[in-house]
Design a protein with these regions (language model features):
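Acidic, surface-exposed loops and disordered segments
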Residues: 1-222
Length: 222
């Protein structure tokens, strides 16, 4: 698979098969992803691979906090408002997701259960917790670099026939995850990457995706 094909075909997977991903395959992907660029070659990312009983424990804890109505206090502040054009895009993908599942807007129970499924990482058998050191002098640049390796990892996974979903809900309740990770007291949990084999027949993995026209985001200066 060439790079262009991987970029165009990769999508967020929201239903995974239960099959475990071989550890050596995950290791290969991570070994290649570490060649992602970073500012000054600092490579500030730190990645935890969570599987097996540890992942089961995390999913239970994560959903438990959601069910209890525990306030979300993520390490990295999440957006509270958007410019109107971004808000429209965010709302549109939410509508597409629910429509693919046949969940009506007024179906409170259906929406709640889908949220719980999301907090279980769509049943992915592997979670990669993407972190940076909180002692970094520039958190913003470290996060930029973390985004670079995250995208690289997702493209490499797609090339191997795997699916990914970059998930904020994996780090909404940091203690649910941090309690399972060694030496994580000085880490900022920025995002989770759900990893596994995609259920290619699931409607939620096949709805039409959209991207804004090039003219909306690119300005030529000559």
């Amino acid at each position: 698979m060439d790079v262009r094909q991987a970029v165009r075909e990769r999508r967020s997977i929201r239903k995974f098969k239960p099959d475990q991903v071989p550890e050596n395959l995950v290791r290969e992907i991570l070994d290649e992803a570490r060649w992602a660029p970073s500012w000054g070659n600092t490579q500030p990312w730190e990645l935890y691979v969570v599987t097996g009983e540890a992942l089961k424990e995390f999913k239970i804890a994560n959903c438990g906090k959601l069910d209890e109505g525990v306030p979300s206090v993520p390490d990295i502040k999440m957006p509270e408002s958007w410019p109107e054009r971004l808000k429209k895009r965010y709302s549109a993908v939410g509508r597409s997701t629910l429509a693919a599942l046949g969940i009506a807007r007024e179906d409170t129970n259906g929406r709640t259960e889908q949220t719980r499924t999301m907090f279980r990482l769509f049943d992915a058998p592997c979670l990669i917790a993407a972190c940076i050191d909180k002692r970094s002098s520039s958190i913003e640049y470290a996060l930029l670099n973390l985004g670079l390796i995250t995208q690289t990892l997702c493209l490499l996974a797609h090339d191997r026939g795997l699916g990914t979903c970059i998930m904020a809900c994996a780090v909404c309740f940091p203690s649910a995850l941090r309690n399972l990770l060694p030496d994580a007291e000085n880490k900022l949990l920025a995002a989770g990457i759900a990893l596994g084999y995609p259920d290619r027949n699931a409607p939620i993995n096949n709805f039409a995706r959209e991207r804004a026209p090039l003219e909306e985001s690119v300005i030529w200066v000559k």
